[in-house]
Amino acid sequence: MVAAKENKFLTVAPFECAWSDDLKFREAGRGCVAFDAFAHNDVTVVFRENVGTQHYHYKKDNSPHYIVIIGSNRNRRLKIQVDGKSVVDEEASDLCRCSLEFQSYWISIYDGLISIGKGRYPFQNLVFKWQDPKPNCNVQYVGLSSWDKHVGYRNVSVFPVTHNHILLWKQVDCREVRGDESGDEKVVEEGTGYDYEQWGLGNFLESWQLSDTVFLVGEEEMDVPAHKVILQASGNFPLRSSDGDVIQLRGVSYPILHALLQYIYTGRTQILESELAPLRDLSSKFEVMSLVRQCEESIDHFKLSKTAFDSCRKVKLLCPISHPLSGFMFPSAFPVDVGKLVKLYSTGEYSDIKIYLSDHSLTFQSHKVILSLWSVAFAKMFTNGMSESHSSTIYLTDVSPEAFKAMMNFMYSGELNMEDTVNFGTELIHLLFLADRFGVVPLHQECCKMLLECLSEDSVCSVLQVVSSISSCKLIEEMCKRKFSMHFDYCTTASLDFVLLDQTTFSDILESADLTVTSEEKILNAVLMWCMKAEESHSWGVIDEMMNYADPKSLFKERLQSLDDLLPHVRFSLLPYELLKRLENSNLSKEIPVFNRLLKEAASFLTSGLISPGNEPISRFQHRRSSFKELQYIRDGDSNGVLHFVGTSYGSHQWVNPVLAKKINITSSSPTSRFTDPKALASKAYAGTSFAGPRMEDGHISSWWVVDLGEEHQLMCNYYTFRQDGSRAFTRFWKFQGSMDGKTWTDLRVHEDDQTMCKAGQFASWPITAANALLPFRFFRLVLTGPTADTSTPWNFCICYLELYGYFR
């Protein structure tokens, strides 16, 4: 289950900490938090056993805790503190890039192993990890904190730590997990119906299924079945390669053998304190050394603590997992010696199944229990009475030998190693198909990770063509679409592979909020090329000339109907008006009705601002948000707004007043003077007297301030801030407006008897909501619509600071 503050923007003030019952690990000591942060420095995350206070300070915290600080020491270092003491203080320039843009991070804790990474998806892009020698396995609550500056957080999610990272990535995108009310965490893989997380060697513990050896225990010679390859990979048992081995254990009781086998098959067991010594001796006899060490440590612990002997007390023994998040990923935590297991595979010793690739006349020797350990599909094949259950040979067709060899090596080593050859990408795709076919979930996950790591603008189309047909690769498909959208120009001009995509995929890319282009004309060209399945790159002008000699049906063939579906994704209103006029006179407009209708609609919108009736999507008349820079409000008087950003020459140097630098222009209703100074509004310096005086316009008194962002810039404003000067002329009635030409104004927010301003020098901020926040403007105006609270100067608009926020370009 995921606890999420989805898309909720949270600002944490200096020396404070935000807590929530939702931000809690499911299992104490084990969990992962992922979030976006927006800060100058000191993104601080606290992990405690209980919820802390709002005014939190680690030096005053006497409870056990971990603190991770990203961007400490002026945004240069990473710090980890344990119970108030610094244990990590590292240079981390790759991680510590707190800035005026949201950065994505994740932090996981697993029994004291703290892992920190960048990016949207947990367990990808690991940057740093540290193991606490004395782990605190009880931390459970997550606090979002700050140091001496405000920090903004959003998209905060808490995940369980699991090997199935692909599932977590789906949760990042979907922001929900369907689970039962009891909170049990279950992972059911798409298309299999199998509960993979519950599958493992424990299913074969003391099971006659696939067994090939038997223990005879005690004087009564009780039969206990086992599997040679598992025993020999975990220790050194007296076994032969032939079937029917029997191991006599007359002097051993069943509970002792059961504990040994349970440890081997599941990585954990529980035994009476009085049976520790016999279990140690039996483990030593068969050289299961990790269990020997566990028994000896428990015996020594009881001796040192001088605890009274209790024959009824049970002791838990666990196989240690040193790297839970590493690439080594057996589906069970059993104490396997990987070197031994690989050797057993290479020699074929104890093999009980031969896999014959019919198309290539190749044979692989393997062990049914190992195949079943990784694949529920193989397990069903060998145990449900199918012909393979009774045969020592199975035949497979339509299988790449290189991919099958890689899958077998993965099953025995727990790692995916593929040679970086010319055909690497093709073989990886074949291996992905194979992992999906047999339900080898960890291998499927590793293939997906490799695909993501090597995914580029050049390969995204070929990968999309393949993964769109695999139901379990929806996440990879979505990430490919996103990459295509963000590099649309390149992906549609460097090659014509995109015309081979199916219509649904291409349509999803065109609809994406991440779609980034240098010109809407590029989208028009791409749609026309896709619809004609072009073999060469063409602009709309070339295609228009082709229509002098061919009608639409012969030019677009079977994709002619697709024009009606795809052309509405082109935002014709973003094209220059002169280009629209050329398009209106083109053959495309004359021969294709939907083309003509969309052009007329765009021309009407540009000339009158009206949208034709018919419930047309409003998105067609908006700028693409992805081409704007995000400048979001954090707090009153921050340095995150547009005027500050422009003053840094759009992020390239130290701040200079943008009015003095002539980057923007601020005007007022009264002439510039000592107390009406436009550059004062762009400065953070407090001014005791700063106002725009009244003037007569169209027979009415008017007082206003206007900001001109410049001919080449626009802002979709979603917040604005101003500051009262030293007077008591508090504004009560005013409008905040936007305009493209400085003449026709659109109301973005109307204030009627607003009582917010009540102190001299006060800051105040207001959000712009609904569709108004999606409209881009060059000019912004604050205009009084009624008298202020000061009867002596009721029409002076008295502010000494102004800042705008939103999406800027």
From Swiss-Prot:
It comes from Arabidopsis thaliana. Residues 211-273, 351-420 form the BTB domain. This is BTB/POZ domain-containing protein At2g30600. Pathway: Protein modification; protein ubiquitination. Transmembrane segments: none annotated. Keywords: Repeat, Ubl conjugation pathway. The BTB/POZ domain mediates the interaction with some component of ubiquitin ligase complexes. It holds the Pfam family Methyltransf_FA. Residues 466-537 form the BACK domain. May act as a substrate-specific adapter of an E3 ubiquitin-protein ligase complex (CUL3-RBX1-BTB) which mediates the ubiquitination and subsequent proteasomal degradation of target proteins. One of its GO terms (biological process) is protein ubiquitination. CDD domains: BTB_POZ_ZBTB_KLHL-like. PROSITE patterns: BTB. InterPro entries: BACK, BTB/POZ_dom, FA58C, Galactose-bd-like_sf, Methyltransf_FA, SKP1/BTB/POZ_sf.
